[in-house]
């Protein structure tokens, strides 16, 4: 949501992409097998984003370096054709399994991403529903599957196709809201092997994962004031979660070093927009 810049709260700098990047880089340096995911809504919320219709955001995200991202409803705010252009500007996979062209049912995005981590194959599938993408309901050419039931069926088709190639762990990246995540988890066949749902849209701040149908559901609010950290040990014999810890880590100057290169890059955009819109 364009939460690029830190704010001073209680005499402490909080949030902002440069400290978020500093924390992610710190974890990547300290730990092995780190994956950084975004569950949609990179766009909007900032004049820096709006002035450049998301191009500035994608350039900032390229420096932030997520491993995999799914789309949210605000990704289509500048139009679907522009989103397809933006997707080509990204240096990271943007996945969605159920956004398609109505006339021939071809997908608009890569539906999944397989991460190879320490000998494991981790399958990520991106999901959004038409209830979230209200602005596409009248579109005669482009749309999503109508409801969460069809989203569940699409997950099943992908899992059944790729599980035979020895997928070790499956994560669904959604942008449908926490209540819908719970409904979705309840619909998934255990034989499909879904382990985790990482959700967005409802901005739900979960202190602990919620388990539905033996699937762990997590969400970490919104913005850059915090990040969800999910440390998972996988039983590779069962291809399932063995143990885990979940926490929401504050992004502030007491926890996070600043990524100065990214800060300078953002300030370049801020200076340009300030000159255009700033008051004398």
Residue ranges and their predicted role:
Residues 262-280:
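Active-site nucleophile-His-acid catalytic modules used for acyl/amide transfer and hydrolysis
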Residues 1-265:
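Acidic, metal/ion-coordinating pockets
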């Amino acid at each position: 949501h364009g939460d690029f810049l830190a704010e001073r709260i209680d005499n402490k700098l909080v949030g902002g992409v440069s400290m978020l990047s500093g924390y992610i880089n710190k974890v990547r340096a300290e730990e092995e097998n780190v994956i950084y995911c975004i569950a949609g809504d990179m766009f909007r919320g900032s004049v820096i984003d709006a002035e450049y219709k998301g191009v500035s955001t994608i350039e900032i995200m390229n420096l932030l370096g997520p491993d995999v991202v799914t789309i949210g409803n605000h990704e289509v705010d500048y139009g679907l054709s522009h989103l397809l252009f933006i997707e080509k500007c990204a240096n990271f996979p943007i996945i969605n399994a159920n956004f398609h062209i109505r006339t021939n049912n071809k997908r608009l995005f890569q539906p999944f991403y397989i991460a190879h981590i320490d000998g494991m194959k981790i399958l990520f599938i991106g999901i959004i529903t038409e209830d979230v993408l209200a602005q596409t309901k009248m579109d005669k050419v482009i749309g999503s599957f109508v409801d969460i039931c069809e989203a569940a069926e699409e997950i099943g088709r992908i899992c059944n196709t790729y599980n035979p190639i020895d997928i070790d762990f499956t994560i669904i990246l959604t942008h449908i809201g926490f209540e819908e995540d719970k409904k979705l988890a309840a619909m998934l066949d255990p034989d499909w092997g879904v382990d985790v749902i990482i959700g967005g849209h409802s901005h739900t701040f979960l202190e602990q994962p919620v388990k539905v149908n033996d699937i762990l559901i997590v969400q970490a609010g919104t913005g850059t004031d915090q990040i969800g950290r999910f440390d998972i040990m996988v039983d590779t014999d069962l291809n399932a979660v063995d143990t885990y810890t979940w926490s929401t880590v504050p992004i502030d100057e007491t926890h996070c070093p600043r990524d100065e290169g990214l800060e300078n890059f953002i300030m370049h955009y801020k200076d340009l927009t300030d000159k255009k819109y700033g008051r004398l």
